[in-house]
Amino acid sequence: MFSIKVLKANGETKFVGRGEEEVYLAATSEYEEGDRVVLEYCGEPRYFVFQADDAMGAALILVRGIVEVKVPFGEARRGYSPKAFAGSCHYIYARYASAEEIDAYRNQALNVYDSHENVNSYPHATANVETRNEAVFAARNAIDGVKANSAHGEWPYASWGINRNPEACLRIDFGH
């Protein structure tokens, strides 16, 4: 059994759904600063298909505990589509991934929901350098699947920014 929730900044539950194999949740209010989408799973590491926001789509991720996706506000929004986490109706779901999905030929590094704070889902990108610690230059942008590169510094042209540091290093952890 697992659940998906939308929590307020103070930890209060706004919406919750629970299930054995899959869970679907319609969150019917605008997000507020500090809100987060949570996938609660306690068990052996397991692959999930998880969608925290319908504008971003689903991700096939390895889960090793509670996964929290902070709803981005302020500067943090610059690394996301303007449609992400917007509006007053949000379709969220999670389900166990099938063996066929896990074994299929795919981009093994793709995780649209990766973030600095989210250390219980994989793949997970980290770096020793990110330009000015801006969301539009975060390590997560290297694995979010957005490939646009004809401009710079705003979504969809987000990238991993190394700030011209010759010692820059990106690490992608797959959770194994």
Label the model's feature ranges.
Residues M1-Y47, A52, L62-D173:
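Disordered, acidic Ser/Thr/Pro-rich linker "stalks" and the adjacent N-terminal cap
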Residues H176:
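Non-cytosolic beta-sandwich-type ligand-binding/adhesion modules
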